[in-house]
Every structure is written in C-alpha cells, then in structure tokens.
C-alpha cells in the first residue's frame, strides 16, 4: 500500500494565510513562507496553497510566495485559486509549483483539464471539487463555494479523471472549517470509483478525523488547515497517531 499523505492547506489572501468556516469569516493565520517552512520541518508530505483573492495583481503576489517557499521547502507544492488558462498554470509552475489545482475554470471549460495534462503531464493537474450535500447526493459549487454548478459531484469527478486529472482535491463545503470530521460518505463515494488519488478536505479537528478519512473515507491523502495553523496538533503527532492505527506514513523528511 502506498504511504498515506498528510497535507497542510494554506489559504492565501493578500500575501497572508487565512482560515474561515464554510469559506467565510476569515481570520489571519500567519506568514505563508514561515508556515510552509515549519510544516516542512514537521514532516508534511506536500503543501497546498490556495489563492483565495485570485485577482491578477494577487496572482503576481502568489507567484512570489511560491518562489520564496520553493527555496525553503523540498516537498511537492500544489497551487490553486483563480487559475483560468495554460498561461496561469505556466506562471506558477515556473515559479516553483509542482502541481496546479483548477476548480471553477475546469467546470466552465472542461477541456482545460486535457490541455493542461497534455502540456505539463497529468501528474501536474489537480482538479479541486467543492461539494455540498443536496438530497441524496452532492452538488458541485464554484466561485469559492458560492455558485451551484448544476453538476453531480461524483459524476464530475469521474469525468475529470477521464479528461486527464492526476488527482482530485475534494472539499466538503458542509464540513469545511467546523473541525467535526470529514464527510466520509462523500470521500468514499468518489474514492471508490476513481483510479487516481483523492485528497479529502474540509472538517479536520483531530488526528482521529484524519484517520477516519483515510480509512472509512478511503482517501489517499488528507488536507487540513486550522488544526495545524493554530498549533492544536503538529504534523508529526498526527502521523505518529496514523502509524499507531496501522496506516503507512512517512515519518521523516
């Protein structure tokens, strides 16, 4: 079995890391370069940066952040938020990102997934899906969780894989920022149907929550933010817990 990955997520707004609940009520969580270096030292397997301001001006700031981080941190960096074109992807990959994450742009232009995979390799293309439970299923939302896309999340994940996505970053809007656990029904429903890795996101409050997403939710990796940003747990503590529960994890850089 491949090692399960623990991935801190850094939402960046105006060059600062922030965290909210269900995508709103943002509060400051620190300097992105300092936090990234700390997580690298603690044993993070990867880092995800999401530019939640995503204006043209801020994208330049994001590229600068990625460039600084890539000099300090020697694990894969995935960067997303407002990427709309091959040129946007190229800017961040040249700045030092290893992967790019696309969300709203992939929904409005699914062929962007294929074009990105063809140009950079599918291992570079992460399709982020923000899903909200509706009835007996889950609907895809875009524009930072504000706009219903009229797509079933499971069907969209299957299509994204077929188009060339190398990974799915799956966020439960219902669970995001609440620290009460991931939506493992959603995680399992999508993980069980795909041949590419699924990163579970939204809801981590304890090491047990991460374990459940990897075990019950069948995710390949877990994304977490506030439990690390505010010092509730270190990455090393979480990974030791996962190892104690029998999951394969990498324990040192």
Curated annotation (Swiss-Prot):
It catalyses: 5-[(5-phospho-1-deoxy-D-ribulos-1-ylimino)methylamino]-1-(5-phospho-beta-D-ribosyl)imidazole-4-carboxamide + L-glutamine = D-erythro-1-(imidazol-4-yl)glycerol 3-phosphate + 5-amino-1-(5-phospho-beta-D-ribosyl)imidazole-4-carboxamide + L-glutamate + H(+). It comes from the Bacteria. Pathway: Amino-acid biosynthesis; L-histidine biosynthesis; L-histidine from 5-phospho-alpha-D-ribose 1-diphosphate: step 5/9. InterPro entries: Aldolase_TIM (IPR013785), His_biosynth (IPR006062), HisF (IPR004651), IGPS_HisA/HisF (IPR050064), RibuloseP-bd_barrel (IPR011060). GO terms for molecular function: imidazoleglycerol-phosphate synthase activity; lyase activity. The active site is at residues 11, 130. Keywords: Amino-acid biosynthesis, Cytoplasm, Histidine biosynthesis, Lyase. It is found in: Cytoplasm. GO terms for biological process: L-histidine biosynthetic process. Its main location: cytoplasm. GO terms for cellular component: cytoplasm. Its EC number is 4.3.2.10. It holds the Pfam family His_biosynth. The keyword Amino-acid biosynthesis applies. IGPS catalyzes the conversion of PRFAR and glutamine to IGP, AICAR and glutamate. The HisF subunit catalyzes the cyclization activity that produces IGP and AICAR from PRFAR using the ammonia provided by the HisH subunit. Belongs to the HisA/HisF family. Heterodimer of HisH and HisF. HAMAP family: HisF. This is Imidazole glycerol phosphate synthase subunit HisF. It comes from Dehalococcoides mccartyi (strain ATCC BAA-2266 / KCTC 15142 / 195) (Dehalococcoides ethenogenes (strain 195)). The gene is hisF.
């Amino acid at each position: 079995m491949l090692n399960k990955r623990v991935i801190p997520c850094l939402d960046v707004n105006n060059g600062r890391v922030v965290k909210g609940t269900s995508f709103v009520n943002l509060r400051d969580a620190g300097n992105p370069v300092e936090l990234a270096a700390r997580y690298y030292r603690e044993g993070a397997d990867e880092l995800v940066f999401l530019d939640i301001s995503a204006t043209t001006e801020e994208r330049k700031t994001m590229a600068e952040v990625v460039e600084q981080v890539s000099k300090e941190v020697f694990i894969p960096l995935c960067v997303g938020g407002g990427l709309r074109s091959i040129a946007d992807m190229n800017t961040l990959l040249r700045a030092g990102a290893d992967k790019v994450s696309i969300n709203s742009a992939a929904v409005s232009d699914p062929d962007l997934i294929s074009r990105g995979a063809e140009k950079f390799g599918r291992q570079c293309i992460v399709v982020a899906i923000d899903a909200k439970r509706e009835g007996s299923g889950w609907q895809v939302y875009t524009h930072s969780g504000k706009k219903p896309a009229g797509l079933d999340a499971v069907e969209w994940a299957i299509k994204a894989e077929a188009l060339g996505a190398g990974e799915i970053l799956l966020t439960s809007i219902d669970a995001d920022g609440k620290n009460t656990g991931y939506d493992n029904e959603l995680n399992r429903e999508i993980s069980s149907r795909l041949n590419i890795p699924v990163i579970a996101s939204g809801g981590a409050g304890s090491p047990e929550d991460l374990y459940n997403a990897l075990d019950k939710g069948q995710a390949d990796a877990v994304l977490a933010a506030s439990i690390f940003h505010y010092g509730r747990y270190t990455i090393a503590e979480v990974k030791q817990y996962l190892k104690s529960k029998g999951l394969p994890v990498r324990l040192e850089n």
